């Protein structure tokens, strides 16, 4: 049977429990028509790139489906009817990924970065004040040291 990756986005107002119920409902439709869900991943509540149906965030869920095309057609029909589902996308694949998807690996990597803690000073270059190698306000090459600034009155008088 053909293999599919199916992702749907549920409204931000829906609770995690409601999203799990939606996933169970969709899985039931798939299995009722002779298909099989090999993997389910809930990516959680994530920000959308742009607003969809007045929503700025959505719950993302991915299903790996092994079943005939009639299963996908029925699942998509059910999702068009359901008001809690904002968008969906089904892609036919040659084989399913083993292990976690790219989105789950990214979430794990981000969590590891947060666990490391922040750097002192907050920036990549650290504190740039008072480094000692820039006397007089920066490297001037062959131009020599800076001369003192003149007042506006003195500058105007010297021009005349």
Swiss-Prot record:
InterPro entries: Ribosomal_bS6 (IPR000529), Ribosomal_bS6_sf (IPR035980), Ribosomal_S6_plastid/chlpt (IPR020814), Transl_elong_EF1B/ribsomal_bS6 (IPR014717). GO terms for cellular component: cytosolic small ribosomal subunit. It comes from Rhodopseudomonas palustris (strain BisB5). One of its GO terms (biological process) is translation. Binds together with bS18 to 16S ribosomal RNA. This is Small ribosomal subunit protein bS6. The gene is rpsF. NCBIfam families: S6. Residues 94-119, 125-152 have a biased composition (Basic and acidic residues). Keywords: Ribonucleoprotein, Ribosomal protein, RNA-binding, rRNA-binding. GO terms for molecular function: small ribosomal subunit rRNA binding; structural constituent of ribosome. Residues 94-160 are annotated as: Disordered. Belongs to the bacterial ribosomal protein bS6 family. The lineage of its organism: Bacteria, Pseudomonadati, Pseudomonadota, Alphaproteobacteria, Hyphomicrobiales. It holds the Pfam family Ribosomal_S6.
């Amino acid at each position: 049977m053909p293999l599919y990756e199916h992702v749907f986005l549920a409204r931000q107002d829906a609770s995690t429990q409601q999203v799990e119920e939606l996933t169970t409902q969709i899985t039931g439709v798939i299995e009722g028509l002779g298909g099989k869900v090999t993997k389910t991943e809930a990516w959680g509540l994530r920000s959308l790139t742009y607003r969809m149906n007045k929503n700025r965030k959505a719950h993302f869920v991915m299903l790996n489906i092994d079943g005939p095309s009639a299963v996908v057609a029925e699942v998509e029909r059910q999702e068009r009817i359901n008001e809690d589902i904002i968008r969906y996308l089904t892609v036919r694949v040659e084989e399913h990924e083993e292990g976690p998807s790219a989105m789950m690996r990214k979430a794990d990597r981000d969590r590891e970065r947060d666990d490391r803690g922040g750097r002192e000073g907050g920036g990549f270059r650290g504190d740039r004040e008072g480094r000692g190698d820039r006397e007089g306000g920066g490297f001037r090459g062959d131009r020599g040291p800076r001369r003192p600034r003149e007042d506006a009155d003195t500058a105007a008088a010297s021009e005349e």
